[in-house]
A protein has these predicted regions:
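Conserved alpha-helix/loop element of class I SAM-dependent methyltransferases that forms part
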Residues: 65-66, 76-99
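Class I SAM-dependent methyltransferase SAM/SAH-binding core
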Residues: 100-102, 111-158
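A short acidic, Gly/Pro-enriched loop at the edge of an enzyme's catalytic core
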Residues: 157-168
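Conserved SAM/SAH-binding loop
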Residues: 108
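Substrate-binding/catalytic lobe of Class I Rossmann-like enzymes that use SAM or dcSAM, i.e.
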Residues: 211-329, 338-340
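N-terminal auxiliary segments of SAM/dcSAM-dependent transferases
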Residues: 2-58
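A short SAM/SAH-binding and catalytic strip from SAM-dependent methyltransferases
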Residues: 167-180
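A short glycine-rich, Lys/Arg-flanked "PGG" loop and its adjoining helix->strand segment in the class I
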Residues: 182-197
Length: 341
């Protein structure tokens, strides 16, 4: 069932209320960003959980159940581009019937279910957010795919599965939530059988990002706060971390740098090339949503603080669109690596 504007955050799994939860997230984000090393992981987990409790309804309302971007070719629909991006991941990993793969950071299961349907493999989704997993299980049952979908409620660094459990693992714009790439890749390495592969689309600040440019720094800061990201690393950090934990790196490249005619990944956020399907996620659509939520809050149709959540997400969306246009940020740094054996 589609999320309706008037139902946003009505089922927030927190007794403090939306407004208090937003403030707790913002304070927690600053604390986690500035915390000492020994407190860092605990603070990160709290921030991630708060963030996804708040934004999941908005993601589904404005984007759908597959929480990621994709480049498009001219004439390709937004929905088709997302599915193609997911199918490519399954193809690269050679997923098929009889295989078991881990989806690290499965969200509400949109991509997981598409990959399970496409490949016939059984997919185990890993997610620390109970609110999202409740939906993922329901969507799997509704789609008739519960036999190919399993879900684990645990954090990325401590996955509740034995060593060498999986034939493959992937992550679609999800390991960006974990700034310590060595730790997250070490855990994925542990989970894979010898010879198995891992693939991901990672958030990265590209080589065009200038840490001395105040415009670049402001865009990165807005992207982090609005996206619940304590850090966004450079591609070299990704590559080095993969090798440090023992992976053989098979391929890395920025899929945003497509050759030939293409529609940029950030187009749905920027709003050029208007279509009804992408209106909610566009800049104009987000403004309409803001104005509607302002009225709905005043009428007490949606909880107090709902507009503030939307504005936090808009901060991220605007920053992503501009950072994408400038070429200083990509959400699709593709990595493909193998565990030796």
């Amino acid at each position: 069932m589609a999320v309706k504007l008037t139902n946003l955050l009505k089922n927030l799994p927190r007794t403090a209320g939306v407004d208090a939860t937003v403030r707790e997230y913002e304070e927690g984000f600053r604390t986690a960003r500035d915390s000492a090393l020994e407190d860092e992981q605990r603070a990160e987990r709290k921030v991630n959980d708060l963030y996804y409790d708040l934004v999941t309804d908005f993601y589904e309302y404005g984007w759908g159940r597959s929480f990621h971007f994709a480049p498009r070719v001219p004439g390709e629909s937004f929905k088709a581009s997302l599915a193609r991006h997911e199918h490519y991941m399954a193809h690269v990993l050679g997923l098929g019937p009889g295989m078991v793969a881990a989806d690290i950071g499965c969200g509400v299961g949109g991509s997981l279910l598409e990959i399970a349907r496409f490949s016939g493999a059984r997919i185990v989704g890993v997610n620390s957010n109970a609110y999202q997993l409740e939906r993922a299980r329901r969507y799997a049952a509704d789609a008739g795919l519960a036999h190919l979908a399993e879900f684990l409620n645990c954090d990325f660094l401590h996955v509740d599965a034995p060593d060498e459990s999986f034939d493959a693992a992937y992550s679609i714009e999800a390991t960006c939530c974990e700034p310590d790439k060595v730790s997250i890749y070490s855990e994925i390495f542990r989970l894979l059988k010898p010879g198995a592969c891992f693939a991901a689309y990672e958030f990265c600040m590209t080589d065009r990002f200038d840490p001395q440019d105040p415009v670049h720094l402001k865009l990165k800061a807005d992207l982090q706060l609005g996206g619940g990201l304590l850090e966004v690393v450079a591609p070299q950090t990704i590559d080095d971390a993969l090798r440090a934990v023992g992976f053989e790196v098979l391929a890395t490249r920025d899929l945003a740098l497509q050759t030939g005619p293409s529609v940029p990944w950030y187009q749905p956020l920027a709003g050029s090339g208007f279509s009804l399907a992408s209106f909610r996620s566009s800049r104009v659509g987000r403004k309409v949503t803001d104005n509607s939520l302002r009225a709905l809050e005043a009428l007490r149709v949606v909880p107090r603080g709902t507009l503030r959540v939307a504005q936090t997400l808009n901060l991220c969306a605007d920053a992503m669109a501009e950072a994408g246009r400038l070429g200083i940020f990509t959400p699709m740094y593709f990595i493909h690596a193998r565990k030796p054996g």
